[in-house]
């Protein structure tokens, strides 16, 4: 039995998210179906981070076990030929049998993309959040400082979150402006359900001048979801990287735009 790692990219608009669901189409279902056909046996995969409905990935990491002998090219080109256009395998490699794409991960990186322009873009409308009002990035970054370290993020978790603990360790949270795009990059050991989108929703209130940077600290300390802002839309969020003890994968979405 061999353990294979896949780096995959997908556009999440047409899917209920990563995880297989009985009622609608998922990225996991499409990938497992294609892999199973190439392997001529049932294949089940594990991913580094389960994305929600409408969320995208430029560097999702997946692993699966199979005793079917296939060259690496078959696991990539052969499976890609069976996958829909909005899901593709970028790379494949054999890894140690102890490797688990989820539990071996040290941290995960997400990007949230905001198109900050007076006029919306037909081209980028499905790829990022449009905000026509000017955003104060300096204040947003001041607010981000309160997010760093291991903290209780109850104020930013959804009511459907099934995690046993609200504590998460954030190593980086920063807004970067590149032309008309504003990129929120956040790195953490893991994230709660809707956590990043809830953070973005609240940080936008700071950037628009409705709240001070210190307000984020107040919301955190409240440990109450009702004290934070509304959830930012899913289509601006991208899973872009994972770090493991021996290697890492990262493809920043803004580098694909610019």
From Swiss-Prot:
Highest taxon of the lineage: Bacteria
Enzyme class (EC, first level): isomerase
InterPro entries, per the entry: PsdUridine_synth_cat_dom_sf (IPR020103), PsdUridine_synth_TruA (IPR001406), PsdUridine_synth_TruA_a/b_dom (IPR020097), PsdUridine_synth_TruA_C (IPR020095), TruA/RsuA/RluB/E/F_N (IPR020094)
CDD domains with a match to the protein in the record: PseudoU_synth_EcTruA
PANTHER family (alphabetical): PSEUDOURIDYLATE SYNTHASE, TRNA PSEUDOURIDINE SYNTHASE-LIKE 1
Binding partners and assembly: Homodimer.
Protein known as: tRNA pseudouridine synthase A
């Amino acid at each position: 039995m061999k353990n294979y790692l896949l780096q995959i990219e997908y556009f999440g608009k047409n899917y209920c998210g990563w995880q297989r669901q009985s009622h609608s189409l998922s990225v996991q279902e499409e990938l497992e179906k294609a892999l199973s056909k190439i392997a001529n046996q049932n294949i089940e995969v594990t991913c580094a981070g389960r994305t929600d409905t409408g969320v995208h990935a430029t560097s999702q990491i997946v692993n699966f076990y199979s005793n079917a002998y296939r060259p690496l090219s078959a696991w990539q080109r052969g499976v890609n030929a069976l996958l829909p256009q909005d899901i593709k395998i970028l790379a494949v490699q054999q890894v140690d049998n102890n490797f688990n794409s989820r539990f071996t991960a040290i941290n995960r990186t997400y990007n949230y993309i905001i198109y900050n322009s007076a006029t919306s873009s037909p081209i980028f409308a499905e790829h990022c959040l449009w905000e026509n009002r000017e955003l104060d990035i300096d204040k947003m970054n001041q607010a981000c400082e309160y997010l760093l370290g291991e903290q209780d993020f109850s104020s930013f978790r959804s009511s459907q979150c099934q995690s046993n603990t609200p504590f998460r360790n954030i190593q980086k949270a920063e807004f970067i402006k590149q032309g008309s795009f504003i990129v929120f990059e956040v790195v953490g050991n893991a994230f709660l359900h809707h956590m990043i989108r809830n953070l973005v929703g609240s940080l936008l209130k700071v950037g628009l001048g409705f709240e001070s940077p210190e307000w984020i600290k107040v919301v955190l300390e409240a440990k109450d979801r009702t004290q934070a802002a509304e959830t930012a839309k899913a289509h601006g969020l991208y899973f872009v990287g994972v770090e493991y003890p021996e290697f890492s994968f990262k493809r920043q979405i803004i580098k694909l735009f610019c």
